[in-house]
UniProtKB/Swiss-Prot annotation:
Protein family per UniProt: Belongs to the PIGG/PIGN/PIGO family. PIGO subfamily.
Annotated membrane topology: Multi-pass membrane protein
Protein name, per record: GPI ethanolamine phosphate transferase 3
Principal subcellular localization: endoplasmic reticulum
Length: 918
């Protein structure tokens, strides 16, 4: 009976203890949620969407009075063509069509447009076609049909497009009962489904990057018969093969030449089938860089091409002194509108491409431009009522010749375009300031808690009062805010609980607070200060990969010197670990994927396209070797540091997953260099990938279940934690290319070395190691082929599990894990730093919370710095190329780290430690 009562008492004590830990986790979550709202508030003010006007241009309401054209065949101007065939070749760069004396595969393969323009200039017009970032397909189609400028934040809708709700070309054609037929890229169907002829249209899934020919073959199956039958008014044929070859293999690959040759043959056949009343337009929606990407960072990524062809003479070339033959993509909208006889969409910002109108004389061109200017002025007046001074600059003088007046109107239209690009970069300062303050307060809260040795007791004690006092007040204020239509955003009210927590935590004297620091903690503060300040310089931000390597090597040297100051029995082991840490970082620093701004000062060594070079084969061999030695190294680490060892079946499971990973990437290399093998056996890769993912997720779920439900001895908890960490590393490394796999393996080894140094140098505080860990994750973010630039994303990992990415959620998860694999790896290693020999659960959780606070604080300071400088330099020339992408990366990493840290804290609170198992 007595024994039963003791067991019940222990069980009750354990339950109360677990609830106390969960309360501490909830309190921690409140702080992290306030950080999230800080990022959200700043983002809402910084990345604004432009206002969309609902007005629509009407046929009976022309913007300018051109009396001679009142009874013409078109709405506002005479119709020149009855039908149009619009051929979009995705990612078709301008120089792909221009002859070059070199051996690049993408040159001299698509020659028909250039040759026709040279031989028959009155029938053919070829020009550069300049896109505006963002250069995702969805945003480019919006620009090509509305004549407007999608904003930076609209980039994300490329993967979840919605119907366009502003005036556009397809709406205008539909209002005139024109039959619009789509073949190819289904992005058109997502954006303009209501306007398309459902019977004739044949949309094709667009995100299947590994499929180089499927969409193009489907287009060719119908397009030639449709042109021959002429049962359409507007035929849109959107080819994707060039874009997919660029993404998968890069532009300078034999497959690109084959694809461009195919496009050349298609265009020739279309030309033969045209009649005199049909206009053929061939264009790209954007270009690509030398790796096949098109984020919009470089000129090659926005430098597309436009070619127009007609069997009847149509084009007259206007001599403009000092003007290069080029057009903005928005210029197609008014040009195509007047050529086909429909109104120009209301929100258009483009100006006429002069050549199709100048063929009919300078008077005709001037009158057409007058309509364009009238449309621009009408939109201008509606959108910005304070623009009267600017509107008066469009002056029509009676003594001007038609051509002189055209040039005046052309310059005016270009100025209007530039003006709107400027005003759509306006920012809302109030939510930006609120967001910045929330991040600052969150930083103070974490800084105060990380030095508190009774942190779990304090957090669990403060959780209930914080919620009870702040929640009702916040709810009342938010409801009042909605009723009174207050300008304050909801994030403003998150300041209240954050500020309350700060005041409640600020109960230590300042000197007592700093007494908790050790010497190397001050050095880590100095390193953090340097990193935080570096974001004030666009050069340091661009070269952040080198800066991170420098800071980590500096930290390694300090650890090496620290070993000499404490001549302990483990002196030799500590020095060897510090030297190995430095050596691994030096080797990793040679793996880099350059960004455009680094120019000729950087040479990319990251292998993104597999080939049969000796370097690639060596990397594959080293990757296989790392898979073999990984379990052995983990076993050696456990024995040396904690006197433990992995069970045989744990080692066998690790070997199994590492073997599958190596086989997958070796097979991937073989198939990538043999098109015939890939065609026959590509399904083998997808089977391997899916087998790997399903099995490793099953093992991970099994291990988490055991840790939360079973009663283990202390050594089993630690051993299983290391096993789970190794499994997660294996999963993340599987989602890397071979060289990225080696970089992540280096990161894994460096984490183990840091754990050794922490155990063997107990006088070094946890703040030092948490800052080192944060820097290490960021450093290997760069060595795994990434940069703080959209163009560095490797989209192939969205298709690692399947030839089709119709399940976009799974594809997005794989892309995310590939991109931020290294920062995630360092984050999930935090519990391993919290274990101490013979420590109990309470001690482990205190270590875990304090280490987590310090780790999140470092990342929060980085995010706060990028937030501040992105806001401070919001008018800087490089804001959208340097400061904004870095702020977005910091925000993503901070949210990711907070999520994983919370999961770890909640999970650790329910792990069965030995004192629970008695």
């Amino acid at each position: 009976m007595e024994e039963k009562r003791v067991k019940c008492k222990k069980k009750l004590t354990s339950t109360i203890g677990t609830w106390k830990y969960i309360q501490a986790c909830i309190f921690f979550a409140i702080i992290l949620i306030s950080n999230f709202y800080g990022l959200k508030s700043f983002t809402d003010g910084f990345l604004l969407r432009r206002a969309v006007l609902n007005q629509t241009s009407l046929c009976e309401n022309p913007p300018a009075d051109v009396r001679e054209w009142k009874n013409s065949s078109g709405c506002w101007a005479p119709k020149i063509f009855e039908r149009a065939v619009i051929v979009i070749i995705d990612a078709l760069r301008y120089d792909f069509l221009i002859p070059y004396n070199d051996s690049n595969y993408y040159h001299n393969a698509f020659t028909t447009p250039y040759e026709t323009s040279v031989l028959h200039p009155e029938n053919s017009y070829l020009t550069q076609f300049i896109a505006d970032a963002p250069t995702t397909t969805s945003q480019r189609l919006k620009g090509l049909t509305t004549g407007s400028l999608p904003t930076f934040i609209d980039l994300g809708s490329n993967f979840a497009g919605t119907n366009i709700d502003e005036d556009n070309l397809l709406l205008q054609w539909k209002s005139l009962d024109k039959q619009i037929v789509l073949l190819g890229d289904d992005t058109w169907d997502v954006l303009f489904h209501d306007y398309l002829n459902e019977t004739l249209s044949q949309p094709a899934f667009s995100f299947n990057v590994p499929d180089l020919h499927g969409v193009d073959n489907k287009v060719n199956q119908y397009v030639f018969d449709y042109i021959k039958d002429a049962n359409f008014d507007v035929l849109i044929a959107h080819y994707l093969g060039v874009d997919h070859v660029g993404h998968r293999l890069g532009p300078d690959h034999p497959t690109m030449r084959d694809k461009l040759n195919q496009m050349d043959r298609c265009v020739k056949e279309m030309m033969d089938l045209l009649d005199d009343s049909t206009l053929l337009i061939v264009m790209g929606d954007h270009g690509m860089d030398n790796k096949g990407n098109h984020g919009g960072d470089s000129f090659d990524e926005i430098n597309s091409v436009l070619w127009m062809y007609s069997k009847k003479p149509t084009f007259g070339y206007l001599k403009q002194p000092g003007k290069v033959l080029s057009a903005n993509q928005v210029d197609l909208v008014p040009t195509l509108s007047l050529l086909l006889g429909n109104p120009i969409p209301y929100g258009n910002l483009g100006t006429l491409i002069p050549e199709p109108f100048y063929y009919y004389g300078d008077e005709y061109l001037s009158k057409a431009q007058k309509i364009n200017i009238g449309q621009l002025n009408r939109f201008f007046s509606e959108y910005d009522l304070d623009a009267s001074d600017f509107l008066s600059s469009s002056v029509h003088k009676n003594n001007n010749s038609y051509l002189d007046q055209y040039f005046l109107d052309f310059d005016y239209a270009r100025d209007a375009f530039s003006y709107f690009k400027a005003i759509w970069a306006e920012f809302s300062l109030f939510p930006m300031i609120i967001g910045f303050l929330l991040l600052i307060i969150g930083g103070f809260n974490l800084a105060l808690l990380m030095q508190d040795k009774s942190v779990i007791f304090r957090m669990s004690a403060n959780m209930a009062p914080s919620v009870m006092k702040c929640l009702p007040v916040c709810l009342i204020l938010i409801l009042a805010n909605n009723e009174l239509h207050s300008p304050f955003p909801a994030e403003f009210y998150v300041l209240l609980p954050s500020f309350y927590i700060l005041l409640n935590s600020f109960n230590q004297k300042l000197m007592e607070y700093f007494k908790g620091f050790v010497k190397l903690d001050y050095f880590s503060i100095f390193i953090t200060f340097l990193h935080v300040c570096s974001f004030g310089s666009n050069s340091f931000t661009v070269w952040e990969d080198r800066l991170c390597h420098f800071l980590i090597i500096t930290i390694g040297l300090v650890m090496f010197c620290k070993c000499f100051s404490e001549m302990s029995p483990l002196f030799a082991c500590s020095t060897y670990s510090a030297l190995a840490f430095i050596l691994l970082q030096v080797i990793s620093s040679y793996v880099t994927n350059c960004r455009e701004e680094q120019g000729a000062f950087c040479v990319s060594t990251y292998i993104s396209t597999p080939d049969n070079s000796l370097r690639t084969l060596i990397v594959l061999a080293l990757m296989a070797l790392s898979s073999i030695i990984l379990p052995l190294i983990l076993q050696l680490h456990l024995r040396r540091v904690l006197g433990l060892s992995l069970k045989l079946y744990h080692l066998s499971i690790l070997y199994f997953f590492e073997l599958i990973s190596s086989i997958f990437w070796i097979a991937h290399h073989v198939f990538a260099n043999d098109a015939l093998l890939e065609k026959q056996y590509h399904h083998v890769l997808y089977s391997l990938a899916n087998t790997y993912v399903i099995c490793i997720l099953g093992v991970l779920i099994w291990q988490f279940f055991l840790l939360s439900r079973s009663k283990f001895a202390k050594i089993n908890v630690i051993e299983r934690s290391y096993f789970v960490f190794a499994l997660l590393y294996s999963f993340l490394s599987f989602l890397q290319r071979p060289l990225g796999h080696l970089s992540l393996f280096s990161c894994f080894l460096q984490i183990l070395l840091l754990i050794q140094l922490k155990q063997w140098q107990p006088s070094v505080g946890h703040n030092f190691f948490s800052v080192t860990l944060g820097l290490l994750g960021l450093s290997h973010f760069f060595t795994t082929g990434n940069q703080a630039a959209i163009s560095s994303l490797d989209w192939n990992f969205a298709f690692i599990h399947s030839k089709s990415a119709e399940n976009q959620a799974i594809s997005a998860i794989f892309m995310f894990l590939h991109t931020v694999g290294a920062p995630i790896l360092t984050c999930i290693s935090i519990p391993l730093f919290s274990f101490e020999p013979l420590s109990k659960k309470n001690r482990f959780l205190i270590n875990l919370f304090r280490f987590s606070f310090s780790f999140i604080l470092y990342n929060l300071l980085i995010s706060t710095s990028t937030v501040f400088f992105a806001g401070f330099f919001r008018r800087h020339l490089m804001v959208w190329k340097v400061f904004a992408p870095r702020f977005m990366l910091s925000g993503i990493l901070l949210v990711t780290h907070q999520l994983f840290v919370l999961i770890q804290c909640f999970g650790s609170s329910v792990v069965k430690f030995p004192e629970d198992a008695e």
